[in-house]
Amino acid sequence: MAISKEKKNEIIKQYARHDGDTGSVEVQVAVLTWEINHLNEHIKQHKKDHATYRGLMKKIGHRRNLLAYLRRTDVNRYRDLISSLGLRR
């Protein structure tokens, strides 16, 4: 199941850098993290769903690239984001 509009708006409001911000790295990573967590729950129940697993791996790679970009450009924002999302690194 895809992310609902309400949930996505809630995540955007929490991580946006300014009003109307939907494309900053923080927002993109936060939305991807929610989707990744949701897909992980699905994969735990449906172990043979290889198409979903592939989509999960693509989302993880996209999030990894965004986090690497943020780490290169602004280390403080990177540290704040991974601590607020509870990601390892």
Curated annotation (Swiss-Prot):
Transmembrane segments: none
Endpoints of the signal sequence: none
Gene3D superfamilies found in the cross-reference section: 6.10.250.3130, S15/NS1, RNA-binding
InterPro entries with a match to the protein in the record: Ribosomal_uS15, Ribosomal_uS15_bac-type, uS15_NS1_RNA-bd_sf
Highest rank taxon of the organism: Bacteria
GO BP of this protein: translation
GO terms for MF: rRNA binding; structural constituent of ribosome
GO cellular component, one term: cytosolic small ribosomal subunit
Keyword line: Ribonucleoprotein, Ribosomal protein, RNA-binding, rRNA-binding
One Pfam family here: Ribosomal_S15
Function as written in the Swiss-Prot or TrEMBL entry: One of the primary rRNA binding proteins, it binds directly to 16S rRNA where it helps nucleate assembly of the platform of the 30S subunit by binding and bridging several RNA helices of the 16S rRNA. Forms an intersubunit bridge (bridge B4) with the 23S rRNA of the 50S subunit in the ribosome.
Quaternary structure, from the entry: Part of the 30S ribosomal subunit. Forms a bridge to the 50S subunit in the 70S ribosome, contacting the 23S rRNA.
Family: Belongs to the universal ribosomal protein uS15 family.
Name recorded for this polypeptide: Small ribosomal subunit protein uS15
Gene source species: Streptococcus mutans serotype c (strain ATCC 700610 / UA159)
